[in-house]
Amino acid sequence: MMRHRGALLAVALEPTNMKKPKMRAVGVVPTQRQVAQLEHEHPEISRPTQLKVRTLDVGICGTDREICTFVYGAPPAGSDYLVLGHEALGEVVEVGSGVKHAKVGDLVVPSVRRPCPDPNCRPCQIDRQDFCATWKFNERGINQHHGYMTEFFVDDEKNFVVVPQELRHFAVLAEPLTIAEKGLTQVWQIQSRLPWACEEPGQPKGKGLRAVVLGAGPIGILGAMTCVLNGFDTYVYSRSPKPNDKAALVESFGAKYISIAECTPAQLAERVGNIDLVYEAVGVSKTSFEVMMHLGLNGVFVFTGIPAPEGHIQVEGNQLMRNLVLKNQVIVGTVNADKAAFQAAVRDLGEFKRRWPLALEKVISARHPVENFRELLTGKATGIKNVIAFGK
Protein backbone atom coordinates (compact mmCIF):
# COMPACT_ATOMS: atom_id res chain seq x y z
CA MET A 1 0.00 0.00 0.00
CA MET A 2 1.16 3.55 -0.64
CA ARG A 3 -0.19 6.91 0.53
CA HIS A 4 -0.85 9.68 -2.02
CA ARG A 5 -2.47 13.04 -1.15
CA GLY A 6 -4.17 11.58 1.88
CA ALA A 7 -5.71 8.63 0.02
CA LEU A 8 -4.72 5.03 0.17
CA LEU A 9 -3.90 3.48 -3.19
CA ALA A 10 -3.38 -0.23 -3.73
CA VAL A 11 -0.57 -0.86 -6.16
CA ALA A 12 -0.44 -4.21 -7.88
CA LEU A 13 3.12 -4.95 -8.83
CA GLU A 14 3.57 -7.29 -11.77
CA PRO A 15 5.87 -10.14 -10.79
CA THR A 16 9.19 -9.71 -12.50
CA ASN A 17 9.22 -13.37 -13.47
CA MET A 18 5.78 -13.31 -15.14
CA LYS A 19 6.04 -14.72 -18.64
CA LYS A 20 4.52 -12.79 -21.51
CA PRO A 21 1.92 -14.71 -23.54
CA LYS A 22 3.09 -16.58 -26.61
CA MET A 23 1.47 -17.54 -29.92
CA ARG A 24 2.20 -19.78 -32.87
CA ALA A 25 4.51 -18.58 -35.61
CA VAL A 26 6.47 -20.08 -38.49
CA GLY A 27 10.02 -18.95 -39.10
CA VAL A 28 13.65 -19.74 -39.67
CA VAL A 29 16.50 -20.10 -37.19
CA PRO A 30 19.53 -19.28 -39.37
CA THR A 31 22.21 -20.32 -36.87
CA GLN A 32 20.68 -23.80 -36.73
CA ARG A 33 19.51 -23.83 -40.36
CA GLN A 34 16.02 -24.74 -39.19
CA VAL A 35 12.56 -24.02 -40.54
CA ALA A 36 10.27 -24.42 -37.57
CA GLN A 37 7.02 -23.67 -35.81
CA LEU A 38 7.94 -21.25 -33.04
CA GLU A 39 6.53 -19.69 -29.91
CA HIS A 40 6.51 -15.98 -30.64
CA GLU A 41 5.67 -13.20 -28.21
CA HIS A 42 2.07 -12.03 -28.46
CA PRO A 43 2.17 -8.37 -29.62
CA GLU A 44 0.38 -5.45 -28.01
CA ILE A 45 -0.22 -1.89 -29.17
CA SER A 46 2.54 0.38 -27.86
CA ARG A 47 1.83 3.60 -29.80
CA PRO A 48 -1.47 5.43 -30.40
CA THR A 49 -1.24 5.14 -34.21
CA GLN A 50 -0.97 1.35 -34.23
CA LEU A 51 -3.40 -1.40 -35.16
CA LYS A 52 -3.47 -4.90 -33.73
CA VAL A 53 -4.40 -7.39 -36.43
CA ARG A 54 -5.45 -11.04 -36.36
CA THR A 55 -3.83 -12.91 -39.24
CA LEU A 56 -6.23 -14.57 -41.67
CA ASP A 57 -4.18 -15.57 -44.73
CA VAL A 58 -0.47 -15.60 -45.55
CA GLY A 59 0.73 -16.27 -49.10
CA ILE A 60 3.79 -18.42 -49.80
CA CYS A 61 6.16 -17.06 -52.43
CA GLY A 62 9.59 -17.74 -53.88
CA THR A 63 11.19 -15.28 -51.46
CA ASP A 64 9.93 -17.30 -48.48
CA ARG A 65 11.25 -20.49 -50.00
CA GLU A 66 14.65 -18.91 -50.70
CA ILE A 67 14.92 -17.63 -47.13
CA CYS A 68 14.33 -21.23 -46.05
CA THR A 69 17.50 -22.21 -47.94
CA PHE A 70 19.38 -19.61 -45.84
CA VAL A 71 20.82 -17.69 -48.80
CA TYR A 72 19.46 -14.47 -47.28
CA GLY A 73 17.06 -13.20 -44.65
CA ALA A 74 18.13 -11.89 -41.25
CA PRO A 75 16.38 -11.88 -37.84
CA PRO A 76 15.73 -8.63 -35.98
CA ALA A 77 18.41 -7.44 -33.59
CA GLY A 78 18.30 -9.48 -30.40
CA SER A 79 16.42 -12.41 -31.93
CA ASP A 80 17.87 -15.70 -33.15
CA TYR A 81 14.90 -16.35 -35.45
CA LEU A 82 12.93 -14.57 -38.17
CA VAL A 83 9.16 -14.99 -38.45
CA LEU A 84 8.37 -15.45 -42.14
CA GLY A 85 5.55 -14.08 -44.28
CA HIS A 86 5.17 -10.81 -46.17
CA GLU A 87 1.98 -11.42 -48.20
CA ALA A 88 -0.87 -11.19 -45.73
CA LEU A 89 -4.49 -10.40 -45.01
CA GLY A 90 -5.76 -9.73 -41.52
CA GLU A 91 -8.66 -8.43 -39.46
CA VAL A 92 -8.30 -5.46 -37.12
CA VAL A 93 -9.00 -6.48 -33.51
CA GLU A 94 -7.79 -3.37 -31.68
CA VAL A 95 -6.95 0.23 -32.59
CA GLY A 96 -4.77 2.80 -30.86
CA SER A 97 -6.21 6.07 -29.60
CA GLY A 98 -4.62 8.01 -32.48
CA VAL A 99 -5.87 5.81 -35.32
CA LYS A 100 -7.83 7.94 -37.79
CA HIS A 101 -9.48 5.63 -40.30
CA ALA A 102 -9.31 1.90 -39.55
CA LYS A 103 -11.75 0.34 -37.12
CA VAL A 104 -12.20 -2.98 -35.38
CA GLY A 105 -13.52 -5.57 -37.83
CA ASP A 106 -11.91 -4.04 -40.92
CA LEU A 107 -10.00 -6.30 -43.28
CA VAL A 108 -6.52 -4.98 -44.01
CA VAL A 109 -3.43 -5.85 -46.04
CA PRO A 110 -0.04 -4.72 -44.70
CA SER A 111 2.90 -3.43 -46.69
CA VAL A 112 6.37 -4.97 -46.38
CA ARG A 113 9.23 -2.46 -46.34
CA ARG A 114 9.90 -0.01 -43.51
CA PRO A 115 11.96 3.20 -43.84
CA CYS A 116 15.64 3.42 -43.04
CA PRO A 117 16.65 5.59 -40.05
CA ASP A 118 18.79 8.02 -42.06
CA PRO A 119 17.27 11.53 -41.84
CA ASN A 120 18.98 12.41 -45.12
CA CYS A 121 17.28 9.64 -47.10
CA ARG A 122 14.70 11.67 -49.00
CA PRO A 123 12.59 8.71 -50.22
CA CYS A 124 12.21 7.23 -46.73
CA GLN A 125 11.41 10.61 -45.24
CA ILE A 126 8.33 10.82 -47.47
CA ASP A 127 7.30 7.15 -47.03
CA ARG A 128 8.72 6.07 -50.38
CA GLN A 129 11.06 3.48 -48.93
CA ASP A 130 10.58 1.46 -52.12
CA PHE A 131 13.21 3.89 -53.47
CA CYS A 132 15.39 3.92 -50.32
CA ALA A 133 18.73 5.58 -51.04
CA THR A 134 20.76 3.94 -48.26
CA TRP A 135 19.77 0.26 -48.53
CA LYS A 136 19.33 0.27 -44.73
CA PHE A 137 15.57 -0.37 -44.75
CA ASN A 138 14.10 -3.48 -43.18
CA GLU A 139 11.33 -5.69 -44.51
CA ARG A 140 8.74 -7.66 -42.58
CA GLY A 141 9.31 -11.37 -42.93
CA ILE A 142 12.45 -10.87 -45.01
CA ASN A 143 15.11 -8.77 -43.36
CA GLN A 144 15.51 -7.67 -39.72
CA HIS A 145 11.77 -7.46 -39.01
CA HIS A 146 9.42 -10.29 -38.07
CA GLY A 147 6.76 -11.13 -40.65
CA TYR A 148 3.11 -12.07 -40.67
CA MET A 149 3.22 -15.87 -40.49
CA THR A 150 1.85 -15.78 -36.96
CA GLU A 151 -1.47 -15.37 -35.19
CA PHE A 152 -1.39 -11.61 -34.50
CA PHE A 153 0.77 -8.64 -35.46
CA VAL A 154 0.93 -4.93 -34.70
CA ASP A 155 1.98 -2.09 -36.99
CA ASP A 156 1.32 1.57 -37.70
CA GLU A 157 -1.94 2.46 -39.45
CA LYS A 158 -0.08 4.05 -42.36
CA ASN A 159 1.34 0.64 -43.27
CA PHE A 160 -2.09 -0.85 -44.00
CA VAL A 161 -4.72 -0.59 -46.71
CA VAL A 162 -8.33 -1.38 -45.82
CA VAL A 163 -9.94 -4.06 -47.98
CA PRO A 164 -13.65 -4.42 -48.89
CA GLN A 165 -15.27 -7.41 -47.20
CA GLU A 166 -16.20 -8.90 -50.57
CA LEU A 167 -12.48 -9.43 -51.29
CA ARG A 168 -11.96 -11.58 -48.18
CA HIS A 169 -10.94 -14.65 -50.22
CA PHE A 170 -8.65 -12.82 -52.67
CA ALA A 171 -7.00 -9.93 -50.82
CA VAL A 172 -3.95 -12.00 -49.87
CA LEU A 173 -3.00 -11.50 -53.54
CA ALA A 174 -2.71 -7.73 -53.09
CA GLU A 175 1.00 -7.69 -52.22
CA PRO A 176 2.17 -9.72 -55.26
CA LEU A 177 -0.14 -7.64 -57.44
CA THR A 178 1.56 -4.43 -56.26
CA ILE A 179 4.61 -5.43 -58.30
CA ALA A 180 2.62 -5.07 -61.51
CA GLU A 181 0.86 -1.94 -60.26
CA LYS A 182 4.12 -0.13 -59.52
CA GLY A 183 5.72 -1.47 -62.69
CA LEU A 184 2.90 -0.23 -64.89
CA THR A 185 2.86 3.15 -63.16
CA GLN A 186 6.51 3.53 -64.12
CA VAL A 187 5.78 2.42 -67.68
CA TRP A 188 3.23 5.21 -68.08
CA GLN A 189 5.69 7.71 -66.61
CA ILE A 190 8.43 6.56 -68.98
CA GLN A 191 6.17 6.54 -72.02
CA SER A 192 5.02 10.08 -71.38
CA ARG A 193 8.27 10.87 -73.27
CA LEU A 194 6.51 9.93 -76.52
CA PRO A 195 5.12 13.05 -78.24
CA TRP A 196 1.81 11.38 -79.09
CA ALA A 197 1.32 9.69 -75.71
CA CYS A 198 -2.09 10.68 -74.44
CA GLU A 199 -5.18 8.96 -73.14
CA GLU A 200 -8.30 8.60 -75.22
CA PRO A 201 -11.34 9.46 -73.11
CA GLY A 202 -13.11 6.30 -72.01
CA GLN A 203 -10.36 4.01 -73.33
CA PRO A 204 -7.73 2.07 -71.35
CA LYS A 205 -4.17 3.38 -71.64
CA GLY A 206 -2.84 0.22 -73.25
CA LYS A 207 -5.35 0.07 -76.08
CA GLY A 208 -3.59 -0.73 -79.35
CA LEU A 209 -0.36 -1.79 -77.59
CA ARG A 210 1.15 -5.26 -77.22
CA ALA A 211 2.56 -6.70 -73.99
CA VAL A 212 4.54 -9.89 -73.41
CA VAL A 213 4.62 -11.31 -69.88
CA LEU A 214 7.50 -13.68 -69.13
CA GLY A 215 6.42 -16.45 -66.77
CA ALA A 216 3.13 -17.95 -65.63
CA GLY A 217 3.68 -17.97 -61.89
CA PRO A 218 1.60 -15.76 -59.59
CA ILE A 219 3.57 -12.59 -60.42
CA GLY A 220 3.25 -13.30 -64.14
CA ILE A 221 -0.44 -14.21 -64.08
CA LEU A 222 -1.39 -11.21 -61.95
CA GLY A 223 0.76 -9.04 -64.22
CA ALA A 224 -1.00 -10.44 -67.28
CA MET A 225 -4.39 -9.73 -65.72
CA THR A 226 -3.28 -6.15 -65.08
CA CYS A 227 -2.09 -5.76 -68.68
CA VAL A 228 -5.39 -7.08 -70.06
CA LEU A 229 -7.31 -4.80 -67.70
CA ASN A 230 -5.29 -1.86 -69.06
CA GLY A 231 -6.17 -2.70 -72.65
CA PHE A 232 -2.95 -4.38 -73.85
CA ASP A 233 -3.05 -7.21 -76.35
CA THR A 234 -1.34 -9.55 -73.88
CA TYR A 235 0.80 -12.66 -74.43
CA VAL A 236 2.18 -14.90 -71.67
CA TYR A 237 5.44 -16.61 -72.66
CA SER A 238 6.20 -19.56 -70.39
CA ARG A 239 7.91 -22.96 -70.35
CA SER A 240 5.21 -25.62 -70.37
CA PRO A 241 3.68 -26.62 -73.70
CA LYS A 242 -0.08 -26.50 -74.14
CA PRO A 243 -2.43 -27.88 -73.02
CA ASN A 244 -1.85 -27.15 -69.34
CA ASP A 245 -3.79 -25.59 -66.48
CA LYS A 246 -1.88 -22.31 -66.50
CA ALA A 247 -2.42 -21.85 -70.23
CA ALA A 248 -6.15 -22.45 -69.76
CA LEU A 249 -6.23 -19.94 -66.91
CA VAL A 250 -4.35 -17.30 -68.92
CA GLU A 251 -6.68 -17.66 -71.90
CA SER A 252 -9.77 -17.53 -69.67
CA PHE A 253 -9.18 -13.83 -68.95
CA GLY A 254 -8.32 -12.81 -72.50
CA ALA A 255 -4.55 -13.20 -72.77
CA LYS A 256 -2.76 -15.57 -75.15
CA TYR A 257 -0.39 -18.31 -74.01
CA ILE A 258 2.75 -19.22 -75.96
CA SER A 259 5.19 -21.91 -74.84
CA ILE A 260 8.96 -21.35 -74.90
CA ALA A 261 9.27 -25.02 -75.86
CA GLU A 262 7.32 -24.41 -79.07
CA CYS A 263 8.34 -20.88 -80.05
CA THR A 264 11.72 -19.11 -80.04
CA PRO A 265 11.96 -15.45 -78.99
CA ALA A 266 12.40 -14.49 -82.66
CA GLN A 267 9.26 -16.44 -83.60
CA LEU A 268 7.47 -14.85 -80.65
CA ALA A 269 8.22 -11.39 -82.04
CA GLU A 270 6.92 -12.45 -85.45
CA ARG A 271 3.65 -13.67 -83.93
CA VAL A 272 3.13 -10.71 -81.62
CA GLY A 273 4.30 -7.87 -83.86
CA ASN A 274 5.93 -4.79 -82.36
CA ILE A 275 6.38 -5.60 -78.65
CA ASP A 276 5.61 -2.41 -76.74
CA LEU A 277 6.07 -3.85 -73.26
CA VAL A 278 7.84 -6.84 -71.75
CA TYR A 279 6.91 -7.55 -68.13
CA GLU A 280 9.50 -9.99 -66.82
CA ALA A 281 8.20 -12.23 -64.02
CA VAL A 282 10.37 -15.31 -64.31
CA GLY A 283 13.72 -14.44 -62.70
CA VAL A 284 15.69 -16.25 -65.42
CA SER A 285 18.29 -14.02 -67.02
CA LYS A 286 18.92 -16.13 -70.14
CA THR A 287 15.29 -16.11 -71.28
CA SER A 288 14.89 -12.45 -70.33
CA PHE A 289 17.83 -11.19 -72.38
CA GLU A 290 16.91 -13.38 -75.34
CA VAL A 291 13.45 -11.79 -75.41
CA MET A 292 14.92 -8.33 -74.83
CA MET A 293 16.70 -8.63 -78.18
CA HIS A 294 13.23 -8.55 -79.79
CA LEU A 295 11.70 -5.65 -77.86
CA GLY A 296 9.92 -3.35 -80.28
CA LEU A 297 10.34 0.27 -81.33
CA ASN A 298 9.91 2.69 -78.41
CA GLY A 299 9.41 -0.32 -76.14
CA VAL A 300 9.89 -0.73 -72.39
CA PHE A 301 11.29 -3.81 -70.67
CA VAL A 302 10.39 -4.14 -66.96
CA PHE A 303 12.49 -6.44 -64.78
CA THR A 304 10.84 -7.77 -61.59
CA GLY A 305 12.63 -11.10 -61.03
CA ILE A 306 15.81 -11.70 -59.05
CA PRO A 307 17.94 -14.53 -60.48
CA ALA A 308 20.26 -16.66 -58.39
CA PRO A 309 23.68 -15.00 -57.93
CA GLU A 310 25.71 -17.83 -59.41
CA GLY A 311 26.05 -18.61 -63.11
CA HIS A 312 26.90 -16.60 -66.21
CA ILE A 313 25.18 -16.06 -69.54
CA GLN A 314 26.35 -14.66 -72.85
CA VAL A 315 24.65 -11.51 -74.07
CA GLU A 316 24.91 -9.95 -77.53
CA GLY A 317 25.99 -6.65 -76.01
CA ASN A 318 26.66 -4.76 -79.23
CA GLN A 319 23.29 -5.62 -80.75
CA LEU A 320 21.48 -4.92 -77.50
CA MET A 321 23.08 -1.50 -77.23
CA ARG A 322 22.26 -0.73 -80.87
CA ASN A 323 18.63 -1.65 -80.26
CA LEU A 324 18.37 0.50 -77.15
CA VAL A 325 19.69 3.54 -78.97
CA LEU A 326 18.22 3.16 -82.44
CA LYS A 327 14.81 1.92 -81.26
CA ASN A 328 14.38 4.36 -78.35
CA GLN A 329 14.03 1.52 -75.85
CA VAL A 330 14.05 1.68 -72.06
CA ILE A 331 14.96 -1.00 -69.50
CA VAL A 332 13.76 -0.52 -65.93
CA GLY A 333 13.90 -2.59 -62.77
CA THR A 334 11.24 -2.38 -60.09
CA VAL A 335 11.07 -3.66 -56.52
CA ASN A 336 8.70 -3.25 -53.60
CA ALA A 337 5.79 -0.78 -53.74
CA ASP A 338 4.28 2.29 -52.13
CA LYS A 339 0.86 2.72 -50.57
CA ALA A 340 -0.64 3.93 -53.86
CA ALA A 341 0.34 0.61 -55.47
CA PHE A 342 -1.39 -1.30 -52.65
CA GLN A 343 -4.52 0.80 -53.09
CA ALA A 344 -4.43 0.15 -56.84
CA ALA A 345 -3.97 -3.57 -56.22
CA VAL A 346 -7.04 -3.73 -53.98
CA ARG A 347 -9.05 -1.76 -56.56
CA ASP A 348 -7.95 -4.02 -59.42
CA LEU A 349 -8.62 -7.21 -57.45
CA GLY A 350 -12.19 -5.98 -57.22
CA GLU A 351 -12.24 -5.48 -60.98
CA PHE A 352 -10.71 -8.92 -61.59
CA LYS A 353 -13.43 -10.43 -59.39
CA ARG A 354 -16.12 -8.63 -61.34
CA ARG A 355 -14.76 -9.56 -64.79
CA TRP A 356 -13.08 -12.93 -64.26
CA PRO A 357 -14.29 -14.47 -60.97
CA LEU A 358 -13.43 -18.06 -61.92
CA ALA A 359 -9.95 -17.10 -63.14
CA LEU A 360 -9.23 -15.17 -59.94
CA GLU A 361 -10.31 -18.16 -57.85
CA LYS A 362 -7.84 -20.37 -59.71
CA VAL A 363 -4.87 -18.12 -58.93
CA ILE A 364 -5.07 -19.41 -55.34
CA SER A 365 -4.30 -23.10 -55.76
CA ALA A 366 -5.09 -24.13 -52.18
CA ARG A 367 -5.43 -22.98 -48.60
CA HIS A 368 -3.51 -25.02 -46.05
CA PRO A 369 -3.44 -25.37 -42.27
CA VAL A 370 -0.42 -23.99 -40.44
CA GLU A 371 0.78 -27.54 -39.80
CA ASN A 372 1.62 -27.91 -43.52
CA PHE A 373 4.25 -25.15 -43.37
CA ARG A 374 7.30 -27.37 -43.85
CA GLU A 375 6.06 -29.00 -47.04
CA LEU A 376 4.98 -25.63 -48.45
CA LEU A 377 8.26 -23.88 -47.65
CA THR A 378 10.80 -26.61 -48.35
CA GLY A 379 9.03 -29.14 -50.58
CA LYS A 380 8.51 -29.00 -54.32
CA ALA A 381 6.58 -25.93 -55.42
CA THR A 382 3.18 -26.81 -56.87
CA GLY A 383 0.25 -24.86 -58.26
CA ILE A 384 0.23 -21.08 -58.55
CA LYS A 385 -0.32 -19.43 -55.16
CA ASN A 386 -0.51 -21.48 -51.97
CA VAL A 387 -1.86 -19.85 -48.84
CA ILE A 388 -1.55 -20.68 -45.15
CA ALA A 389 -4.90 -20.01 -43.48
CA PHE A 390 -4.54 -18.77 -39.91
CA GLY A 391 -8.16 -17.73 -39.49
CA LYS A 392 -11.62 -18.15 -40.95
Protein language model features and the residues they cover:
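Mid-domain Rossmann-like dinucleotide-binding core that forms the NAD(H)/NADP(H) cofactor-binding site
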Residues: 167-262
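Glycine-rich phosphate-binding loop and adjacent beta-alpha segment
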Residues: 285-351, 390-392
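Glycine-rich beta-strand-centered segment in the early N-terminal region that forms part
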Residues: 43-58, 73-122, 164-166
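C-terminal hydrophobic helical "lid"/dimerization subdomain
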Residues: 3-21, 289, 338-392
